[in-house]
C-alpha cells in the first residue's frame, strides 16, 4: 500500500513537471510581476508552521546552529551560515 502510494506520488510529480516544462515556453511573458504572498498574508509562513507542527523551536534551532558554525571547518560552515541566515528571518 505504501509502495503504491509512493509510486503514484512520484508519477504525478513527474507528469506535472513534464507538463510544466512543455507549457513554460508557450505561456505569454508578463511584464508586471504579481504581488508577493508576504504582502497579502503577512503572518503565513509555511516553514515556521512546519517546524512548529514538528515541535521544533526556531529559537533553539538558531542558537544550536550558531554553536555549530563556531565548531565547523570553513567549507561546511558556509552551508550552515546560509541555513542560519534563512532561519533568522523566522525569529
Curated annotation (Swiss-Prot):
GO CC annotations on file: extracellular region; extracellular space
Entry superkingdom: Eukaryota
InterPro entries: Secretoglobin_3A
Signal peptide: 1-21
Annotated localization: Secreted
Disruption phenotype: Viable and fertile, with no gross abnormalities. Lung tissue appears normal. In a C57BL/6NCr strain background, animals show a mild increase in ovalbumin-induced inflammatory response in lung. However, in a mixed genetic background, there is a reduced ovalbumin-induced inflammatory response, possibly due to the presence of modifier genes.
Keywords tagged on the record: Disulfide bond, Secreted, Signal
Annotated tissue distribution: Highly expressed in lung where it localizes to epithelial cells of the trachea, bronchus and bronchioles (at protein level). Expressed in club cells of the bronchioles. Also detected in the anterior and posterior lobes of the pituitary gland where it may localize to gonadotropic cells (at protein level). Not detected in other tissues tested.
This protein's record includes keyword Transcription regulation: no
Family: Belongs to the secretoglobin family. UGRP subfamily.
Function: Secreted cytokine-like protein. Binds to the scavenger receptor MARCO. Can also bind to pathogens including the Gram-positive bacterium L.monocytogenes, the Gram-negative bacterium P.aeruginosa, and yeast. Strongly inhibits phospholipase A2 (PLA2G1B) activity. Seems to have anti-inflammatory effects in respiratory epithelium. Also has anti-fibrotic activity in lung. May play a role in fetal lung development and maturation. Promotes branching morphogenesis during early stages of lung development.
Subunit and interaction comment: Homodimer; disulfide-linked. Monomer. Interacts with APOA1.
Protein name, per record: Secretoglobin family 3A member 2
Organism: Mus musculus (Mouse)
Amino acid at each position: 500500500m505504501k509502495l503504491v502510494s509512493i509510486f503514484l506520488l512520484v508519477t504525478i510529480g513527474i507528469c506535472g513537471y513534464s507538463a510544466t516544462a512543455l507549457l513554460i515556453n508557450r505561456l505569454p511573458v508578463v511584464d508586471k510581476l504579481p504581488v508577493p504572498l508576504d504582502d497579502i498574508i503577512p503572518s503565513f509562513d509555511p516553514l515556521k508552521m512546519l517546524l512548529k507542527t514538528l515541535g521544533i523551536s526556531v529559537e533553539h534551532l538558531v542558537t544550536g546552529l550558531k554553536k555549530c558554525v563556531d565548531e565547523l571547518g570553513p567549507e561546511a560552515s558556509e552551508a550552515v551560515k546560509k541555513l542560519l541566515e534563512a532561519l533568522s528571518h523566522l525569529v
